[in-house]
Amino acid sequence: MPSFDVVSEVDKHELSNAVDQANRELATRFDFKGTDAKFELEGFVVTQVAPSAFQLKQMLDILRGRLSARGIDVRCLEVADPLENLGGARQKVTVRQGIEQPVAKKLIAAIKGAKLKVESQINGDKLRISGKKRDDLQEVIALLRKTDVDLPLQYQNFRD
């Protein structure tokens, strides 16, 4: 029985490369000369540090540009509110991994609503779709691409 997995993952190596490139761009930009602005990566959380909240917005644009240049979809970013104090401003940007339960249920409901002859089940942070025909699975992939989800979806482990 053919099957495939629907996942939402970000390559950690590409993420660290994008953050390094963003830090290098900060060093060369005129409006950030002499400031202590930087990006820090810990796991899948990028912390932006800058003297003011206005610069955090500019830094977020730089980060988004670098992520998209490295092939990472920016829909996976979850931006927290900036924290300001006398020493400067900080903002955490979390890179979401996996498909959360409510989103997975929404995807399953969309598949069931299309009345395709496939079975879908939630496996942790993945979604496994299986059906009798490969054509049905390809229809599911086309349907999920049209579905409005604020997460980037990848289709892996296609088995025949």
Swiss-Prot record:
What one GO molecular function would you report for this record? nucleotide binding
Q: Name one GO cellular component term.
A: cytosol
Signal peptide extent: none
State if Flavoprotein is listed as a keyword. no
Key words of the record: Nucleotide-binding
The question of whether Cytoplasm is a record keyword is answered with: no
Give the InterPro entries listed for this entry.
DUF520 (IPR007551), UPF0234-like_C (IPR035571), UPF0234_N (IPR035570), YajQ-like_sf (IPR036183)
Pfam families given for it?
A: DUF520
Its annotated function is as follows: Nucleotide-binding protein.
The family classification in the record reads: Belongs to the YajQ family.
Write the protein's name.
Nucleotide-binding protein Bpet3698
Q: Which organism is it from?
A: Bordetella petrii (strain ATCC BAA-461 / DSM 12804 / CCUG 43448)
